[in-house]
Amino acid sequence: MAKRRKSSRTKAKETNWQERVIQIRRVSKVVKGGKKLSFRAIVVVGNENGQVGVGVGKAGDVIGAVRKGVADGKKQLIDVSLTKASSITHITRGVSGGAKVIVRPAAPGTGVIAGGAVRTVLELAGVKNILAKQLGSSNPLNNARAVINALEGLRTFSEVAQERGVPLEHLYT
């Protein structure tokens, strides 16, 4: 009976998640007997419907590292407010370490114009039309976290309308 309950819980949580590995790196730790090798995986998890997260996993084998990265990414999910044109609501910037990212909304039909880890994060968030530029560091982990930082700073149309004291319909025109 416990098995049946557990499987129904996992089915309810699993809602069409996609995962993409950005980087797998072999890392080593110096111990008394020599070097201990392990793998670090950077994974982006998203549902292409406004939720995305970046996770890092370390393990003795690649599959274990990816599995841990996916679990970590699901713990760090954020919600992204998208427009009707599958873009973001306004221009925003994100920083993580030495990586800086500028993200701008784009007209329908533009596509995702971004590179590397930034592109992967935006695609799995469900953004279809966007312009993004990486500045500073080219480190995939810092760039992925910088995009997440930028997307966390987004405000919805209703928040902007409330701050300005303007009806929501006036923002669309």
UniProtKB/Swiss-Prot annotation:
RNA-binding listed as a keyword: yes
Pfam families assigned to the protein according to its UniProt record, in alphabetical order: Ribosomal_S5 (PF00333), Ribosomal_S5_C (PF03719)
Alphabetical UniProt keywords: Ribonucleoprotein, Ribosomal protein, RNA-binding, rRNA-binding
GO molecular function: rRNA binding; structural constituent of ribosome
One GO CC term on file: small ribosomal subunit
Record bears the keyword Protein biosynthesis: no
S5 DRBM domain span: 17-80
Superkingdom field: Bacteria
Any GO BP: translation
HAMAP family: Ribosomal_uS5_B
Domain commentary: The N-terminal domain interacts with the head of the 30S subunit; the C-terminal domain interacts with the body and contacts protein S4. The interaction surface between S4 and S5 is involved in control of translational fidelity.
Subunit relationships: Part of the 30S ribosomal subunit. Contacts proteins S4 and S8.
Entry's family note: Belongs to the universal ribosomal protein uS5 family.
Function statement: With S4 and S12 plays an important role in translational accuracy. Located at the back of the 30S subunit body where it stabilizes the conformation of the head with respect to the body.
Name of the protein described by the UniProt record: Small ribosomal subunit protein uS5
